[in-house]
Amino acid sequence: NCDKPFLVIESAKKEYRSLALADKAQSLKVYTLGRPEYNCPEINPFFVQQGISLQTHIDFLKDLFNASFSFYGPMPYILEKCLQNIYRKRGWNLTLGYHPYFLGLNKKRLGADTLDAADIRSRYACKASKYLFPTMEDLKGEVKRYIEQEMTYEGEVAGNIKSAMLARLESLCSGSKGYMFNTRGRLDMSTLLNERAVF
């Protein structure tokens, strides 16, 4: 019996899950990916952790999508433009890497007091802040809009690119993957790392 926090990530085997049966205090949290009925986490991949620059986060998202799906031709470029657009539409400043809400809406200029970590942390903690971040559905809609209205490709080429990208994103917007990734929910990493948990 261990009172120390731990996190076990077991992707294939399920042996650690049996600890939950033996845990009388029920302090062990078991997360089950892809099974909403069994404590499936909601993870908005577009949520930017406090202290991470927006551009770095967008670069990580590009790498994640490129590793998960086989993008070809102009798809990586389209993805990058659409990622930037969905944050811009939510009010983010791509140059500074912040949303004005986190800096204080009434501040006219950036100064030393603008980047007060405690103030930003309290704004992140506000439940309404989750609406400042895009969702997978936002990305899917932006890809569709961008290809139809801004892309210079026409005819069959544009149709093939649109179909390929939307099919890939649709798979992340529906079913159990949609429950996990097409959400405004966010997994609180500080809580997760301070509890006894099995993924």
PLM features: residue spans?
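P-loop NTPase motor domains
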Residues: 1-199
